[in-house]
UniProtKB/Swiss-Prot annotation:
Residues engaged in binding Zn(2+): 333, 384, 510
Annotated GO biological process: threonyl-tRNA aminoacylation
Region forming the signal peptide: none
Species of origin: Neisseria gonorrhoeae (strain ATCC 700825 / FA 1090)
EC number assigned by the record: 6.1.1.3
Chief location bin: cytoplasm
Cofactor note: Binds 1 zinc ion per subunit.
GO MF entries: ATP binding; metal ion binding; threonine-tRNA ligase activity; tRNA binding
Gene: thrS
Name listed for the protein in its UniProt record: Threonine--tRNA ligase
Known catalytic reactions: tRNA(Thr) + L-threonine + ATP = L-threonyl-tRNA(Thr) + AMP + diphosphate + H(+)
Family named by the database record: Belongs to the class-II aminoacyl-tRNA synthetase family.
InterPro entries in the record: aa-tRNA-synt_IIb, aa-tRNA-synth_II, aa-tRNA-synth_II/BPL/LPL, Anticodon-bd, Anticodon-bd_dom_sf, Beta-grasp_dom_sf, TGS, TGS-like
Length: 637
């Protein structure tokens, strides 16, 4: 007899072997119908997999996150089933789960159209309505190869070649369609009803631009119809907020093919940039940072010594001059070590906090570029803290407090923390990494924050704390980082004189709050839907006259507002006021000021905040109100 322990600690006995589906059926008909898969001793398995020894078992249903991911993975297989019925010559590649969805890469003779995707979705719905069972068969490797050879699935054969030698692999049968996978998958298509194909894109085989282009069909799937509806509404809202669309509408920036991954900032966009940079500079100065500037291009030997050449060369732009090879800096950290090394440093100089709005370039694949979110040329609000081991915790706490306050100023109140641990490709010994990872854990504990850990996600030179902000649509964006580095000071021979007159290596803390300014501005645009808070708006108000008679007074009002430090624009066009209000509304200025004869005579301004009419105000009172609004945002949050 088998002893099966359930999550409530109850134990049930079964004849050996028993499947997850059979266990669910023995508990109740409702659970049997809802069972998507199972978890046996912590490992996900198909509902049909046999259990042959005493085990702890959990029934996975669509209510579980694992259940949702299994549904999404099975929907990807269903895409394959529909595509092969409609386009028999298509070659299936891979179909993984991604955040809130899935995709399938497909090799086709000609690109799919939106109409093709609609036809694929319709066929998927027809297949779901057939309510067929998905059958898993563990198949010998040689037989699996034969199956895909007979079907002409060359990409599946390439994938099998890359796999470790195994006796058998899971082949999932969707009626006449077969696909290979580690699984698990749903036992029946009835679980796949709440899905939607969302977009079509191109993707290179293995993500390499030297390889052939494939067609990628994206989709999403959920446990219930309401969850799917909510997701679609969120996607539609996200499309309205797309920073690329709003960047053009608000006249902030543009990108063009002649400079891939590089941004052309327009006057309004550059005003937004400068507002952010100047605000950050003020905050950093108050926190004891010293601003520096380091070269854009440095000799190859410098990057070899820092370790970047061995670990990051493929992402660096390289040039040569006068028989010397140079690299454009992808990071600011090695340059900051040179400033630290320029002179004899004492323990009394520590902590030394060096900040730079550093312009960096990384050779990102062209297919990965995406508006402001993924660029090749960018500026980081970068800083490096050189300190002793005893100062790590206090510096981490101070940084955490600074970061949280700044995020609140920008409108982000929901911040989550993750600790990224050593990657496979790294510099430094395991002892050094043990020390660095434990140092960050102690720092996070001292900050009183909860965190999750991400094995393998650290930088090559050290572990890092990642700060993720949640935007108005509930999306999470990684912005801030704090990285602990014992490696670079050693490689670049950084040292200081200790209290005992010995020489010691400083600890180096790499930290950023916004990350890439370009990307952070993209996040801000989408979070605020282009309707920025007053202190941040590139144009804070527009002043409009009703007739030419008020033009001079409009200029006086603009001059007074500008003298008070506000970014005010004039609209004195010979147009009806209703038209000017509507036209300026598209730019989402925080305030619109309308001036007619009455306002001119009474030395007042008629104020509209977004769509709200605030009435006629004394100009000095209005300025005081604006100043208080900014104080509330930046000081009182």
């Amino acid at each position: 007899m088998l002893n099966i322990t359930l999550p409530d600690c109850s134990v049930r006995q079964y004849e050996s072997p028993v499947t997850v589906a059979q266990i669910a059926a023995s508990i109740g008909a409702g659970l049997a119908k809802a069972a998507v898969a199972g978890k046996v001793n912590g490992k996900l398995v198909d509902a049909c997999d046999p259990i042959v020894e005493d085990s702890a078992v959990q029934i996975i249903t669509p209510k579980d996150q694992e259940g949702i991911e299994i549904i999404r993975h099975s929907c990807a297989h269903l895409v394959g089933h529909a595509v092969k019925q409609l386009y028999p010559n298509a070659k299936m590649v891979i179909g993984p789960v991604i955040e809130e969805g899935f995709y399938y890469d497909i090799a086709t003779e000609k690109p799919f159209t939106p109409e093709d995707v609609a036809a694929i979705e319709a066929r998927m719905k027809e297949l779901i309505a057939q309510d067929y069972d998905v059958v898993k068969i563990m198949t010998p490797r040689a037989e699996a190869i034969k199956i895909f050879q007979e079907r002409g699935e060359e990409y599946k054969l390439r994938l099998i070649d890359d796999m470790p030698e195994v006796e058998a692999m899971g082949i999932y049968h969707h009626q006449e369609y077969v696909d290979m996978c580690r699984g698990p998958h749903v036992p029946n298509t009835r679980f796949l009803k709440n899905f939607k194909l969302t977009k079509l894109a191109g993707a290179y085989w293995r993500g390499d631009s030297n390889n052939e282009m494939l067609q990628r069909i994206y989709g999403t799937a959920w446990a219930t119809k309401d969850e799917l509806k909510d997701y679609i509404q969120r996607i539609e809202e996200a499309e309205k907020r797309d920073h690329r669309k709003l960047g053009k509408q608000l006249d902030l920036f543009h990108l063009q093919d002649e400079a891939p991954g590089m941004v052309f900032w327009h006057p309004k966009g550059w005003a937004l940039w400068q507002t952010i940079e100047q605000h950050m500079r003020k905050e950093l100065n108050a926190a004891g940072y010293k601003e520096v500037k380091t070269p854009q291009i440095m000799d190859k030997t410098f990057w070899e010594k820092s370790g970047h050449w061995d670990n990051y060369k493929d992402n660096m732009f390289v040039t040569s001059s006068e028989k010397r090879e140079y690299a454009v800096k992808p990071m600011n950290c090695p340059g900051h070590v040179q400033i630290f090394n320029n002179g004899l440093r004492s323990y009394r100089d520590l902590p030394m906090r060096l900040a730079e709005f550093g312009s960096c370039h990384r050779n990102e694949p062209s297919g990965a570029l995406h508006g402001l979110m993924r660029v090749r040329g960018f500026v980081q609000d970068d800083a490096h803290i050189f300190c002793t081991e005893d100062q790590i915790v206090s510096e981490a706490r101070a940084f955490n407090e600074l970061l949280v306050r700044i995020y609140k100023q920008f409108g982000f109140h929901d911040v989550s923390v993750r600790l990224s641990l050593r990657p496979e490709k790294r510099a430094g010994s395991d002892d050094v990494w043990d020390k660095a990872e434990q140092g960050l854990r102690e720092a996070l504990t001292a900050c009183g924050v909860e965190w999750g850990e991400l094995p393998g996600e650290g930088a090559f030179y050290g572990p890092k704390i990642e700060y993720h902000v949640k935007d108005a649509l509930g999306r999470s964006w990684q912005c801030g980082t704090l990285q602990l580095d014992f490696v670079l000071p050693e490689r670049l021979d950084a040292e200081y004189v200790t209290e005992n007159n010995d020489r010691a290596r400083p600890v180096m803390l790499h930290r950023a709050i916004l990350g890439s300014l370009e990307r952070f501005i993209g996040i801000l645009i989408e979070n605020h839907a282009g309707s920025f808070p007053l202190w941040l708006a590139p144009v804070q108000m527009v002043i409009m006259n009703i007739t030419e008679n008020q033009a001079d007074y409009c200029r006086e009002v603009a001059a007074k507002l500008q003298a008070a430090g506000f970014r005010a624009e004039l609209d004195l066009r010979n147009e009806k006021i209703g038209y000017k209000i509507r036209d300026n509304s598209q730019y989402r200025f925080p305030y619109q000021i309308v001036i007619g004869d009455k306002e001119k005579q009474e030395n007042k301004v008629a104020v509209r905040r977004k769509a709200e009419d605030l009435g006629s105000l004394d100009l000095d009172d209005f300025i005081a109100q604006l100043q208080q609004e900014i104080t509330d945002a930046l000081v009182n949050h």
